[in-house]
């Protein structure tokens, strides 16, 4: 099992009712125990992860402490903060496991920038809510300072800022990530979908956006020529007609059939559909590519073919 694998961790890997650092580290410790058999295998491993709750907390902290002396940091910088924070937690727990196994593998985090197209039409239709809730009066004041920002009412709970979710075009650090992964290193990258940047003259500039982590993980897997993209979520298998009387579990499926189901609206938008779309793109990116969708607990069993949904040409 010497294949190269990108493991896209779902938010449930760090999910906890408590928002303290200690509670989140405990959740990560439990999560990484499920991946221990993979760390003990010859597989070359890159791990991506979500950051929704963590960046949400960071943005609230920024808003509450914003002043002339402690100005709030922008979204792209908060994304970098969350990558470092979660990467540190993951490194700590993975290193603990590697030490217990007397492994000579190492683990490290790459703060990852993801290039997006400044002309992506998704910039004209911001949909991703971020940060704290505001009253209507607070929004009116904020828009005097941020005339280009968009705020939307959120299910009667107040108003939230919404930002675009452009498609990833490239992963700027992909060559470095590939070099590290092709050694004995376990690499943590593309946290929270990566930091969105646009090309500007001879450099890159951060933009206020959120990249879907499944799309970013697919782009990373393609660029580093991974063999397998494993998307870990909160269900053991993909289902068509999920949570309906006629739901049907999928164990093994080809891309052509998967496309047909997606076109028929068999997968929920905003939850399973992006994972399906990312899976299709990756499988079609080269020969003998496969995608596994399952939950964290079944990750190793899915990798050896016993569990999960397996997607291929």
From Swiss-Prot:
Main location: cytoplasm
An individual GO BP term: arginine deiminase pathway
Domain of life according to the entry: Bacteria
Entry's EC annotation: 2.7.2.2
Protein species of origin: Staphylococcus aureus (strain Mu50 / ATCC 700699)
GO function term, MF aspect, one: ATP binding
Cellular component terms (Gene Ontology): cytosol
Similarity field: Belongs to the carbamate kinase family.
Coiled coil, from the record: none
Intracellular or extracellular location(s): Cytoplasm
UniProt-listed SUPFAM superfamilies: Carbamate kinase-like
Signal peptide: none
Gene name of this polypeptide: arcC2
UniProt keyword Phosphoprotein, yes or no: no
Protein name as annotated: Carbamate kinase 2
Catalytic activity: hydrogencarbonate + NH4(+) + ATP = carbamoyl phosphate + ADP + H2O + H(+)
Functional pathway: Metabolic intermediate metabolism; carbamoyl phosphate degradation; CO(2) and NH(3) from carbamoyl phosphate: step 1/1
The entry's keywords: Arginine metabolism, ATP-binding, Cytoplasm, Kinase, Nucleotide-binding, Transferase
């Amino acid at each position: 099992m010497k294949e190269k694998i990108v493991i896209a961790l779902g938010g449930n890997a760090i999910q906890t009712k408590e928002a303290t650092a200690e509670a989140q580290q405990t959740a990560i410790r439990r999560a990484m125990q499920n991946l221990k058999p993979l760390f003990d295998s010859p597989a070359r491993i890159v791990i991506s992860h979500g950051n929704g709750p963590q960046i949400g907390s960071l943005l609230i902290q920024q808003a509450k402490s914003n002043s002339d002396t402690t100005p709030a940091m922008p979204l792209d910088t908060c994304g970098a903060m969350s990558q470092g924070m979660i990467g540190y937690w993951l490194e700590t727990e993975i290193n603990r496991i590697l030490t217990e196994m007397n492994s000579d593998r190492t683990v490290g985090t790459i703060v990852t920038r993801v290039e997006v197209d400044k002309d992506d039409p998704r910039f004209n239709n911001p949909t991703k809510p971020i940060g704290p809730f505001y009253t209507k009066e607070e929004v009116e004041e904020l828009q005097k300072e941020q005339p280009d920002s968009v705020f939307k009412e959120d299910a009667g709970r107040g108003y939230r800022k919404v930002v675009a979710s452009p498609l990833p075009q490239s992963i700027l650090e992909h060559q470095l990530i590939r070099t590290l992964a092709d050694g004995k290193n376990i690499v943590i990258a593309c946290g929270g979908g990566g930091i969105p940047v646009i090309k500007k003259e001879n450099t890159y500039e951060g933009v206020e956006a959120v990249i879907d982590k499944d799309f970013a993980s697919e782009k990373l897997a393609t660029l580093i020529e991974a063999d397998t993209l494993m998307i870990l979520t909160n269900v053991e298998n993909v289902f068509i007609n999920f949570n309906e009387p006629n739901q049907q579990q999928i164990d093994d499926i080809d891309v052509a059939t998967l496309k047909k189901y997606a076109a028929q609206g068999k997968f929920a938008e905003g939850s399973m559909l992006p994972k399906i779309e990312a899976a299709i793109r990756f499988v079609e990116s080269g020969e003998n590519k496969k995608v596994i969708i399952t939950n964290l607990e079944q990750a190793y069993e899915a990798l050896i073919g016993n569990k999960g949904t397996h997607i291929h040409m």
